[in-house]
């Protein structure tokens, strides 16, 4: 049985990349990211997010193929704009594909996709994916020009990059980044886009973002995997979802006290 607390209030996409990172660290078959995804669904995840990187540093092709038919919710596949990745996505046909920038030397995704600067490439990728019946999302910075370009190239969804908000060193810096995200959510809605957000969010910084009425979905992974070390996987998923829903409803979840 899949548990959903206040469905439709705000969606939680649980990213399973770092379950695969832990598996790959020792070259074992455990922990199994497929099992993690299915348990996350049972604990209240509204979708499962996974990033098939070109270097396959965590999620592998076999993970994506094995997981797709087993999910009861949605698969949100993150990938770079390369012909290889687009072809894999069109073969597997997840419900959603989020196009992201990618550099092999980065530890994690460092910024948003430059849709305005790579407009024709992004537009063609959106068309190919849409032709396969896949809903396309673009991972972008909360920038007015990028949001307008995303709408113009035919993507129905954007995911606002919250990394700078999450990594802010001072309250003033964090407040400024939060305002950019809030303004970006408003701009996205005015362009008729579904607005999601994610990157670097954890148990003590997610509340202001989750409270924004224009945000439909948050994608969170590393913080949930880290918290699960201490509380258990399903509990970590349930707690994150409860914190998000409480923030959206204007209340405070009592356990929101430590990042992990």
Swiss-Prot record:
This is Pyridoxine 5'-phosphate synthase. Its EC number is 2.6.99.2. 1-deoxy-D-xylulose 5-phosphate binds at residues 17-18, 53, 58, 108. Belongs to the PNP synthase family. It comes from Cupriavidus taiwanensis (strain DSM 17343 / BCRC 17206 / CCUG 44338 / CIP 107171 / LMG 19424 / R1) (Ralstonia taiwanensis (strain LMG 19424)). Pathway: Cofactor biosynthesis; pyridoxine 5'-phosphate biosynthesis; pyridoxine 5'-phosphate from D-erythrose 4-phosphate: step 5/5. One of its GO terms (cellular component) is cytosol. The keyword Calcium does not apply. The gene is pdxJ. Catalyzes the complicated ring closure reaction between the two acyclic compounds 1-deoxy-D-xylulose-5-phosphate (DXP) and 3-amino-2-oxopropyl phosphate (1-amino-acetone-3-phosphate or AAP) to form pyridoxine 5'-phosphate (PNP) and inorganic phosphate. GO terms for molecular function: pyridoxine 5'-phosphate synthase activity. Keywords: Cytoplasm, Pyridoxine biosynthesis, Transferase. It catalyses: 3-amino-2-oxopropyl phosphate + 1-deoxy-D-xylulose 5-phosphate = pyridoxine 5'-phosphate + phosphate + 2 H2O + H(+). It comes from the Bacteria. GO terms for biological process: pyridoxine biosynthetic process. The record marks 159 as: Transition state stabilizer. It is found in: Cytoplasm. Gene3D superfamilies: Aldolase class I. The active site is at 51 (proton acceptor), 78 (proton acceptor), 199 (proton donor). 3-amino-2-oxopropyl phosphate binds at residues 15, 26, 200, 221-222. Homooctamer; tetramer of dimers. The lineage of its organism: Bacteria, Pseudomonadati, Pseudomonadota, Betaproteobacteria, Burkholderiales. Pfam families: PdxJ. InterPro entries: Aldolase_TIM (IPR013785), PyrdxlP_synth_PdxJ (IPR004569), Pyridoxine-5'_phos_synth (IPR036130).
